[in-house]
């Protein structure tokens, strides 16, 4: 927890950008509300935000979801597909050898984690090209752990694996937690009103 608290400034910058995006949707939406065909998908926005937060925590940089207001590299779509596949195969593991576990199928289909893997590899390559650059993030902590433990017990491949798991797992669970929070607030009027009052009081005191 203390390690995450040290990275709080990274999260704050992404929170600020997320609020700006919400203000744009509320104050100057791309089309008038009366012309919106579908409600705004907040679950999608929350996961875009989560991807950028995890990018900041992991690599000291956003991944561009909120900046572009889009699913960068279809990472969210790919992750959703992978989760659906993994959920099914976890219940019926015998299917895996006929699907992605089949070398012929895997050859013709790109790996569900390929996009996330590419982002991670690019970051590792960037750091190896400039080893003297100072970073204060999770990737740096992983690299420092390898230096402390040694490459025999902590091989280079594990840096990649830890970073991929952090990026994919962290964004998904964070987005789901935010979805759940908003859902239950909307279902619980007293809790919603209490939170709104606390936010209003903090705004008056200049604590936001």
PLM features per residue range, with description:
Residues 4-13, 25-53, 64-74, 97-119, ...:
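Cytochrome P450
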Residues 12, 31-36, 73-81, 138, ...:
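Cytochrome P450 I-helix active-site segment
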Residues 18-21, 57, 82, 119-130, ...:
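Generic, well-ordered alpha-helical scaffold segments in large soluble proteins
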Residues 20-35, 61-65, 126-136, 191-193, ...:
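Surface-exposed helix-capping loop/turn segments at secondary-structure junctions
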Residues 41, 112-177:
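Conserved cytochrome P450 catalytic core segment spanning the I/J/K helices
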Residues 50, 173-198:
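Cytochrome P450 catalytic-core helices
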Residues 84-100, 193-204:
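Short, compositionally biased low-complexity segments
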């Amino acid at each position: 927890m203390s390690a995450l608290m040290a990275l709080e400034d990274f999260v704050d910058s992404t929170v600020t950008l997320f609020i700006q995006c919400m203000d744009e949707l509320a104050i100057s939406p791309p089309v008038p509300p009366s012309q919106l065909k579908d409600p705004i998908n907040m679950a999608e926005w929350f996961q875009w935000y989560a991807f950028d937060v995890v990018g900041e925590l992991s690599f000291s940089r956003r991944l561009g979801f909120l900046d572009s207001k889009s699913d960068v590299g279809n990472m969210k779509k790919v992750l959703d597909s992978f989760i659906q596949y993994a959920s099914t195969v976890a219940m019926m593991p015998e299917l895996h050898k006929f699907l992605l576990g089949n070398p012929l199928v895997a050859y013709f289909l790109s790996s569900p984690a390929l996009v996330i893997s590419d982002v991670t590899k690019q970051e590792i390559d960037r750091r190896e090209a400039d080893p003297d650059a100072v970073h204060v993030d999770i990737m740096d902590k992983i690299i420092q752990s390898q230096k402390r433990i040694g490459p025999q017990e902590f091989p280079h491949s594990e840096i990649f694996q830890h970073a991929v798991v952090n990026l994919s797992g962290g964004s998904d669970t964070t987005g789901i937690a935010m979805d759940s929070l908003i859902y239950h607030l909307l279902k619980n009027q007293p809790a919603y009103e209490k939170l709104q009052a606390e936010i209003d009081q903090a705004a008056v005191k200049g604590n936001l």
